[in-house]
Amino acid sequence: MSRQHGETTTMKTLYIFLTRSGTLLSNLVYRLTGAQYTHISLAFDEDLSTLYSSTRKNGYTMFPAGPSREYLNRGVFLMRENIPCALYALEVTDEAYTRAKRRTQHMMHHGELYRFNSLGLLLCWMHIRWHRRRHYFCSQFVSEVLQKSGALELPKPSTLMHPSDYAELPELRCLYRGTLAGLPQRQSMELGEVESVMGLYLNVLLGAVTVSYTHLTLP
């Protein structure tokens, strides 16, 4: 808790998780920019049981992508345990925490309305500001949640924020820096099984065919 003008303010903690996942897109960004971290996620609990970002929806393949939940013991995080990562804490008011969580949950519940901002990501690394409604890349997603909830004042527009920028913000406190395998929260988790990427693509294809057929047969 903190005191302001004689009043007690209840504080809560948001968690910012930075990684360089080693995927094709991550490696491309790393080679072009040299950025230590190429992906960012947001968590509301210290155990990091659920992370939120705009990323691959099935945890493995690049597409489909958009606002999604991530898990440290599944998907890419399961396959690449030696990737570099960093965990930061951000102290916010109870009201800002609630607004951030409500906004994030709304986007998760209405995921069909949102898309991954591929062009915006490219322009971001070129330092060109470009906004497209309901389209987000990872750092844009986290930045808008934090900014619009009043949790954090950004040094630049959300469409220009890079994951590595968060490692330089004075408001954030570093809790861990190292490999994913050494992260205490992940060490306490039961690891899942690695799924076949081919099987995932087939499921995505079958899902798309089913949706298309449903739309065609509806009266």
Where are the regions that the model predicts?
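Catalytic cysteine-centered active-site loop
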Residues: 22, 26-27, 59-63, 148-182
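Active-site nucleophile-His-acid catalytic modules used for acyl/amide transfer and hydrolysis
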Residues: 25-32, 79-159
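Short, highly charged low-complexity linear segments
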Residues: 74-85, 157-168, 197-212
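Glycine-rich catalytic cores of cysteine/serine-nucleophile enzymes that process amide/ester linkages
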Residues: 19-89, 123-127
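Short, Lys/Arg-enriched N-terminal segments with co-localized hydrophobic residues
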Residues: 1-10
